[in-house]
Amino acid sequence: MKLTKLLSALLVIGLVLGGCKSKKDSNDIVAPIATLYNEGIILLDKKKYKKAAEEFGKIFYQHPGNEMTPQAELMQAYSLFLAAQYEEAVDILNMFINLHPANIDIAYAYYLKALSYYMLISDVNHDQSRTFLSKDSFEDVITKFPNTKYAIDSSLKIDLVNDHLAGKEMMIGRFYLKKKNPMAAINRFEEVIDNYQTTYHSVEALYRLVESYMMLGLHDEAKKYTSVLGYNYPNSKWYSYAYRLVKNYQN
């Protein structure tokens, strides 16, 4: 009787272990690289981006030394980008850049990384660390690959990023003015003038400097910035506001 129970127990253990082994074996099957790649492309065409990324990702682990593997890594990153999984895309692209610095598509990898950071930019009410990462990454593209189409688009994107960063400084500066803290406000508006002068925020920043210096009683400084406004933006509403503000004090 005891022997029968022992044999039954061993049989159950054997079945369990056998089932686990079968399950493990099915997961460890190495599929042909062409099969995985084609399946990824099919899923990509069907807009099943996350599943496509999974298929392309299998190639890296199952065929790490294959000549198609770098292309599969890029396709995985691209699929993650389309799936709006931008941080995951950046991780794959960083790995690609480190492993394949001389790859024919290295410029695209840098560009897609910058674009992924760009998509992570939050509104001006939140932390802008990713905005700076985006700007730095686009600058990398321009520096490393100046004669590519990616450099041209990166330059345009930097203009948009700068506008965003200037908007953040303006928002903080206005807040300080509202709180009657013109010295802190001046630091923010001067940041816009010094580093983001090509953005459309610069004209308002000049006016806010006039406003801030008038609040401090430094009227000569206010007049100076009014003159700068008049010279550079004579038809701007901000120049009209500054001119009236200074003139009303004189009267």
UniProtKB/Swiss-Prot annotation:
Keywords (A to Z) from UniProt: Cell outer membrane, Lipoprotein, Membrane, Palmitate, Repeat, Signal, TPR repeat
Lipid attachment, kind N-palmitoyl cysteine? C20
- Look up the signal peptide feature and give its range: 1-19
Name of one Pfam family that matches: YfiO
| Predominant location category | membrane
Q: Does the keyword Zinc apply?
A: no
Q: Does the keyword Repeat apply?
A: yes
InterPro entries from the UniProt entry = BamD (IPR017689), BamD-like (IPR039565), TPR-like_helical_dom_sf (IPR011990)
GO terms, biological process: Gram-negative-bacterium-type cell outer membrane assembly; protein insertion into membrane
Cellular component GO terms, alphabetical: Bam protein complex
Q: Where are the TPR repeats?
A: 33-66, 70-103, 166-199
Report how it sits in the membrane: Lipid-anchor
Sites of S-diacylglycerol cysteine lipidation: C20
- What does the UniProt record say this protein does? Part of the outer membrane protein assembly complex, which is involved in assembly and insertion of beta-barrel proteins into the outer membrane.
Family membership, please give it: Belongs to the BamD family.
Summary of subunit composition and partner proteins: Part of the Bam complex.
Name of the protein: Outer membrane protein assembly factor BamD
Q: Which organism is it from?
A: Rickettsia prowazekii (strain Madrid E)
